[in-house]
Amino acid sequence: MTSRFRHVALIGKYQASGARAQADARDGVMEDIGAFLESQGCEVFVEKSAAEEADADASVGGRYQPLTVEEIGQRCDLGLVVGGDGTMLGIGRQLACYGIPLIGINRGRLGFITDIPLDNYQATLIPMLAGEYEEDHRSLMHAQVMRDGASVFDALAMNDVVVNRGATSGMVELRVSVGRHFVANQRADGLIIASPTGSTAYALSAGGPLLHPAVPGWVLVPIAPHTLSNRPVLLPDADEIVIELVAGRDASANFDMQSLASLAIGDRVVVRRSDFRVRFLHPRGWSYFDTLRKKLHWNEGGS
């Protein structure tokens, strides 16, 4: 069976470092997947950072042409991401503007968005490469940190934007506005603005609801609020959300927990819906509810 995707970028462990990343680069998985893709008629490239990690034994870095993220966006029609959800978050944000679909092979832990098991990837990928797949689009958030009327930090987020206190400081006080409307001043350890994708991450641990990916909304979740009546709020993603730091020391804004901006009193974190979306491809028959049931261990012990 010949692949409908002619130019495939192999992307792996995009932000990993240290002993685990070095072991991953040398265990032959990336090389095996690359050889499999070639057997399906694909021209294989490797993302530059993955190539540099693999250069220790030249298993991947020396066999396939390395490309920057920009070059992948311009030359490839599929990205195959090998890693965990963090790997997918990082590359998904960067490739969203190019509209390239992504397939995730899970070698992390939970794997909500890298959903193909490593031990069964060949049987799963063969029909997908031939065009038998489910397509799933995920929204992105565009966030800016505004200081004295100027943007001092700018980032995309697929999971969440989190404004929180410093590790050794007390609560922060945050002024929250949605659209043109003032919501409240909240005293808490922090506040999470989560997308549907991020509703299964930090927001879920903080007591937020699950939000189906097809819902055009965000969820606003307080972290350990001083007032117990402060509850998660579901919002339309067409509205701009503004979080202003009123009081607190060593506060910061985190974007997918992969980039961070320190905040000063009076700084405003402005979150809007991005114009870009991430395209995921899943095996035929994939269901969001199957993922929830498996990853959250629903029905365990039941009939």
Curated annotation (Swiss-Prot):
> Does this entry carry the keyword Acyltransferase?
no
Q: Which family does it belong to?
A: Belongs to the NAD kinase family.
The answer on whether this UniProt entry bears the keyword Cytoplasm reads yes
Q: What is this protein called?
A: NAD kinase
Residues engaged in binding NAD(+): 85-86, 159-160, 187, 189, 200-205, 224, 258
Organism of origin: Variovorax paradoxus (strain S110)
Which InterPro entries is this protein grouped with? ATP-NAD_kinase_N, ATP-NAD_kinase_PpnK-typ_C, NAD/diacylglycerol_kinase_sf, NADK
Which Pfam families does its entry note?
NAD_kinase, NAD_kinase_C
Lineage summary: Bacteria, Pseudomonadati, Pseudomonadota, Betaproteobacteria, Burkholderiales
